[in-house]
Amino acid sequence: MIMDKKQFADFCADLESGRIRVAEKIDGNWKVNAWIKEAILEGFKLGTLTDMTEGQFPFIDKDTIPVRKFTVEDKVRIVPGGSSVRRGAYLAPSVIM
């Protein structure tokens, strides 16, 4: 699977919205969608190491999969303790991290 950064960003948006999922429950069993797993790995290959320091939390990671930012409108609770959510992760409303 070959994609560019724009295609990968669109792919992440589909993951974040829940339109596509890495795994699905089919007939009571969980099935991994291997093509999605491969696309996520491709995103790491596409990325460039970037300084993503946030306040007092310094870190360096690939620019294709940054930490997600949430607002009150997302209805997701992010509590203190070192949790982070990367780009491409789906969090339903009312989730507590």
Question: Where does each model-flagged region fall?
Answer:
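Terminal amphipathic alpha-helical/low-complexity segments used for targeting or macromolecular assembly
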Residues: 1-77
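Structural signal for interior beta-strand "rungs" in well-ordered beta-sheet cores
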Residues: 72, 76-97
